[in-house]
Structure formats: C-alpha cells, structure tokens
Amino acid sequence: MYTQDRFMSPQYKARFKGYVQVTKPGIIFGNLISVAGGFLLAAKGDVNLALMLASLVGLSLVVASGCAVNNCIDRDIDAKMQRTCKRVTVTGEIAVGNVLAFGLALGVLGFSILALFTNALALLFAVIGYIVYVGVYSLYMKRNSVYGTLVGSFSGAVPPVVGYCSVTGQMDMGAAILLLMFSLWQMPHSYAIAIFRFNDYAAANIPVLPVAEGMTKAKLHIVLYIAVFALVSALLPLAGYTGIAFMAVTCATSLWWLAMALKGYRHGVDIQRWARQVFGFSIITIMALSITMALDSQVIKEQVIGQTNLFTLVK
C-alpha cells in the first residue's frame, strides 16, 4: 500500500511528467511519422513488422535521448526564454545530472535496438544525426552561428533515412532524396519559429537568421527554401519511387505553402501571425507527404507486379 501511495502521490506524478517532458513527445511523434514514411516507402508493401517496430522504437529512443541531453545543454539559454523558462532543467525540479543520465540511458537503449535489429547503415545514420544534433548543433552552432539552423536541419532529416535504410541497407537515390527533402523542409519551418519567437531568441542572444540578419532576409530564405523543397520533393515520383498521388499531394501542398510564404511581403502584414501560419502549414505539408509516400509506394509495387505478369503472359 505504501509503494502504491508513493507512486500515486502528486510529487511522483510531477517528477514522472518532468522526465516525459524533457524527451519532447511532440518531436518524437513527428519523427515517428517520418521514420514510418521512409520505412514504408522502401518496403513498397512488403512490410517486416518486427523490423519496422525495431526501427520506430529504436529511433524514438535516440530522439528522446537527444532531446533530454539538449535540455541539459540549453538550460542557461532556456532560462532567458519565456517559452522554455519553466523546463525542469531550469527550475531545478529534477537535477541536471539525473536528466543527463536518463537521456544517455535512453540513447544506449535506442542505439542497441537499432544495432541488434536493423543494419549498419541505419545505425550509422542514427549515430551521425545524434552527434550532429547534440555535439555540433546544441553545444556550438546554435549559440555561435547564423548557420546553426542549417547544421541542425541535417539531424532533423535523419529519421526518415534511418527508416528507409533499415529496409534497403544501402544509400541509394531514394535515401538521398529523402535526406535532401527533409533537410530543406527544416529550414523554413525553423525560420518561421524564429520569427514568431523572435523576442525569446533575441533575449537569449541566439543568432538565428531573423535576429542576426533581419526579417527581410529571413522572409526571402523562407520563400527560396520552400521553392527548392517543392522541386526536390517532386524527384520521388519522377525517379519512380512514388506515383501520381504523391506528385499531386506534393504539388498541392508545396504550392499552397509557397503562396502562404509570399504573403509575408504584403504591405502591413502581421509578421507574427504570418510566421505562425507558415509554421503550421509546414507541419501539415510534411505529415501529408510522409503518409502519401508510404501509401503511394505500394501502388508503384502493384504496377510493377502487374507489368511483370503481363510480360510473362505475352512471353
């Protein structure tokens, strides 16, 4: 009874909630969708459920680890930002050492699952993405360079590639397109956040593009990155990895997103509201494309099988 009462106590619940929060569940969920999208794109309907589960769980734990360690690294700048000043690593509700140990334990478990159940290439991408996010981005680039977002975009693009390579075991054109596509998506998504959270980033002296070089340049970069993202996304169907459904969805979402970005140049536009709209639609775009590429790749496989069967009959 004592043990049960202890686990049900408000203090225990608050501590448990704190440990969950440092892993950033929203980010984990978004990465789960992209991992599944990359995996199913490569599988083309021939899904190994055990392998898929291992990829999803392993990568989720790696992402959770990176987020927890990032909370420890960023606690000084988090204290200066309204959005993050209540994090447990800032308030001291949970000791930083405990959060760090928790994060590293999650990483060991996640990498172990990927090592045991996927393949060397998937594991390698996960390791590189982790090192870039924790070691390069969080420890140095985020604080010291306007190019921090660009570096961070690589680690954000790794999850779908891990999912894809878990199936194929090789770095082919499909994996390269995914890596480039998701890296490009990260840029306008992140710049939009930096605009509507401008005061926070300025208070913490983080040199994101809007703070370091102004809103005009940030708006231009958002438009340019969305335009290039649209072109790169179209490479998946053009290269035969997906079909017409993906092409239709990528054209519709990318053009709508681009049109939304161009509204930032309207006279008298509410820049904060505009940035939130660009950010919100960036999530809709990447979710729609992740789901569509997973489903549309199955159609491609069925078409290939049908053509093969027809060829066999004619022969």
UniProtKB/Swiss-Prot annotation:
Q: Which Pfam families match?
A: UbiA (PF01040)
The metabolic or biological pathway listed in the UniProt record of this protein is: Porphyrin-containing compound metabolism; heme O biosynthesis; heme O from protoheme: step 1/1
GO BP terms: namely: heme O biosynthetic process
List the Gene3D superfamilies hit by this protein, alphabetically.
UbiA prenyltransferase
As one GO molecular function, the record gives: protoheme IX farnesyltransferase activity
Q: Where in the cell is it found?
A: Cell inner membrane
* Topology in membrane: Multi-pass membrane protein
Q: List its EC numbers.
A: 2.5.1.141
Transmembrane stretches, by residue range?
Answer: 25-45, 49-69, 87-107, 120-139, 145-165, 176-196, 220-240, 242-262, 280-300
Annotated InterPro entries: Protohaem_IX_farnesylTrfase, UbiA_prenyltransferase, UbiA_prenylTrfase_CS, UbiA_sf
Q: Which family does it belong to?
A: Belongs to the UbiA prenyltransferase family. Protoheme IX farnesyltransferase subfamily.
* Reported function: Converts heme B (protoheme IX) to heme O by substitution of the vinyl group on carbon 2 of heme B porphyrin ring with a hydroxyethyl farnesyl side group.
Q: What name does this protein carry?
A: Protoheme IX farnesyltransferase 1
Q: Which organism is it from?
A: Shewanella sp. (strain W3-18-1)
Annotated gene: cyoE1
